């Protein structure tokens, strides 16, 4: 799961939202120095990643990506799973998607004091470009994935992974629809951030 799913599975506080994204920005961060609510959010982030990455259906779905892109299939799956969460939002939640996105953007801005500089830069871009609303469109996902490919520090053939997603869209969607309800139950059951 990528940023939007992590935010969705967080508590509705700035510290929790930041902690639930911080797992992707931990370079140089002393975890012990984080405020407890941020640290709990970070633990929740790790639970979500561990469950998703180890799920047999997710692992098996990596084979749907061409051999030259398979090494980065996990990244592509995280992003496309956010797309599916947005696309199927009303299947899982009663609150409107628009109000959740607006609130999450506001909470991320409130939580800037807890962020590393790279995280602050990324979240500013997320909010300013309204990335989550753009995730509804496959063409936008392709642009996001190609930008990620451009940031990888070594030669790779990850660019164009949207073509693998298009070719196996229905299969990937079914994987998401099977895995996400299980993930929600795991997060609630673990109660990493009390009150789940």
Task: Tell me the role of every PLM-derived stretch.
Residues 1-43, 47-196:
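N-terminal leader/auxiliary helical segments
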């Amino acid at each position: 799961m990528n940023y939007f799913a992590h935010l969705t599975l967080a508590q509705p506080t700035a510290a929790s939202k930041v902690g639930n994204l911080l797992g992707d920005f931990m370079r140089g961060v002393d975890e012990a120095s984080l405020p407890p609510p941020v640290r709990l959010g970070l633990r929740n982030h790790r639970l979500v990643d561990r469950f998703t990455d180890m799920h047999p259906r997710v692992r098996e779905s990596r084979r749907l990506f061409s051999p030259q892109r398979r090494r980065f299939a996990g990244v592509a799956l995280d992003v496309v799973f956010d797309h599916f969460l947005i696309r199927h939002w009303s299947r899982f939640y009663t609150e409107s998607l628009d109000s959740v996105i607006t609130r999450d953007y506001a909470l991320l801005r409130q939580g800037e004091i807890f962020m590393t500089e790279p995280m602050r830069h990324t979240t500013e871009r997320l909010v300013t470009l309204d990335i989550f609303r753009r995730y509804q469109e496959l063409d936008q996902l392709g642009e996001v994935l190609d930008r990620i490919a451009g940031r990888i520090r070594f030669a790779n053939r990850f660019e164009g992974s949207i073509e693998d997603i298009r070719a196996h869209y229905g299969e990937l969607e079914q994987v998401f629809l099977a895995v996400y309800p299980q993930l929600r139950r795991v997060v609630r059951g673990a109660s990493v951030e009390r009150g789940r």
